[in-house]
Design a protein with these regions (language model features):
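FAD/FMN-dependent oxidoreductases across multiple families
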Residues: 1-78, 82-86
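C-terminal helical "tail/cap" subdomain of flavin- and related membrane-associated enzymes
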Residues: 58-160
Length: 160
């Protein structure tokens, strides 16, 4: 039974801001979530990425020695470098999918063709271990390099 009206939305564009590259950062300002990186919501990564960013913030805030101090550049830079590592994975996954459509505008990642080819091979595999590892990567439980182990490569390409 329909419980309400059906609503559609349009996603205008993905944006990533590289705060980790700033030489100076406004003291006392914290930037997280979509303010740093807004990817296509179709992939459902926003909350997970924001939670991982919050953990990176907690790690960096623990480095502040006195309670009540504002966030000095000495903390801001390591924090943004930490979240850049988180965003690299999310961004590559989401943008890589977006760019398979010809209507997507912008500069394709250098690794697009190779990543797309490999992802297609992983998706075509009928090996349950490959599928399990793929979903662990997609849900940020494991880094993408876990799909590149000799065992996973064998299971992806040789075992059908």
């Amino acid at each position: 039974k329909l419980v309400g009206e059906i609503h559609s939305f349009k996603f205008k564009k993905a944006i990533r801001r590289h705060f980790e590259e700033l030489k100076k950062f406004p003291e006392g300002l914290v930037v997280l979530g979509d303010a740093v990186c807004r990817a296509n919501p179709f992939f459902g990564q926003g909350i997970t990425v924001a939670a991982l960013e919050a953990l990176a913030l907690e790690k960096n805030l623990k480095k502040i020695s006195r309670s009540g101090d504002s966030i000095p550049m000495a903390i801001a830079r390591p924090f943004f470098k930490d979240i850049a590592k988180i965003l690299d994975v999310s961004w590559e996954m989401a943008v890589g999918e977006d760019f398979k459509y010809r209507t997507t505008k912008g500069r394709r990642p250098v690794t697009f063709a190779l990543t797309r080819w490999f992802k297609d091979k992983v998706m075509a595999s009928n090996d349950p271990e490959v599928a399990k590892q793929f979903y662990r990567v997609m849900h940020f439980a494991e880094p993408p390099t876990k799909l590149l182990t000799p065992k996973m490569l064998y299971r992806t390409f040789m075992k059908h």
